[in-house]
Amino acid sequence: MSETVFDWFLERGFIEQSTSDDLKTILKTPLSFYFGIDPTAESPHLGNWVGILASMKLQKLGHRPIILVGGATGLIGDPSGKDLERPLLSAEVIQKNVDSLTQVLKKFLDFNHPTAAPLIVNNYDWFSKMNMIEFLRDVGKQFRLGTMLAKESVKNRVNSEEGMSFTEFSYQILQGYDFYYLFEKYGVNLQIGGSDQYGNIVAGIDLTRRLSKKTVYGLTFPLLVRSDGKKFGKSEKGAIWLKEELCSPFEMYQYLVRVPDKDVKRMLQMLTLLEMDEINLIVKEIEKTPNLAQKRLAEEVTLLVHGEKGLKEALGATDALSPGKMNFCEEGLTAMQENMPNIELSSSDVLSKPYIDVVVRSGLIESKSEVRRLIQNQGAYLNGKKITDPNFVITKDFLLQENLCVVSAGKKKSVLIRLKF
């Protein structure tokens, strides 16, 4: 067993809080740990990737992952980090999400590991067998109201105008019991999670100590936020999902390749398995080779999430869609239609109309004056070819497949226009 797994996490900034100074020593020998995801959606998102990646690293070093998909807790809703109560999802939606999440999560773990084969469990399996009296008498009795009310996630909500329902208030008891149950059944003695889960993790540690007289541990990692304070992992379209049907490898790659320089080192540390020496070398090249670090980040994460096939698809689509070298073969056009923002316009709004008007109508640029400036600055393109004449008019000769054209602003913003005749 490697003695550096704790240091590996610490060096990369993975550790926000640890419940014990003994954890570094504890992690020197194999243990079972758990990481939980509630099925509030049918896929994990990029924010969940930190916990999944940590689970992958721990498993590589011989620790056994137990991944908990919260079929029961998902029906209740976690108030942690939320200003308002979540809308409750139906049992049917939760079950559909449980099934989908389970399939996605299976991709990232080694089920053939000789000593640390993972388990994916659903807490609905044990909570559905408990009645209310049993739960309140055996579990609820172990929780002190003062401690529960003192938690930040509870205190902030209770004192807010919206308040907090008993349903949400009880969430920490459910998650606390999960830890105790997994300790008793599978010998789990470590829970990992985002920093917003610290209070829930401590609840499980306290419950296990009360009921089993044993010590278990918790480790949290920081939530992914950008340098401007905004949550990392959301594009204009919404969350960056790990399920390919919801977010293509190309979309994930494009999101990551646009990470600002000031954020890219942190994201390389938190989202990839690259060693710190290599990350430091990559970051040193930022000034000499712009976007090199972002490309490496995008390649590494896309490869980990979507495999070699997904990375190849993302790189192929990126190449096909780059202004100045757009690939208009059948494969390239397919990549554009699947991955590029697109709009349908009447042919009368495009043909024989000034390029400037069409760009504004497409939504790529808001005003004609901005488009004129773009042309002056050599950043306007039609089908990958630079437009230098502000009076340029689009004709049928410039259509692809007789009904398509691509307008671009610089190298990163493009819209595919589908003409309706």
Predicted regions and their residues:
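Conserved phosphate/anionic-ligand binding catalytic regions in large, soluble enzymes, centered on
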Residues: 200
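Conserved nucleotide- and phosphate/pyrophosphate-binding catalytic cores
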Residues: 210-421
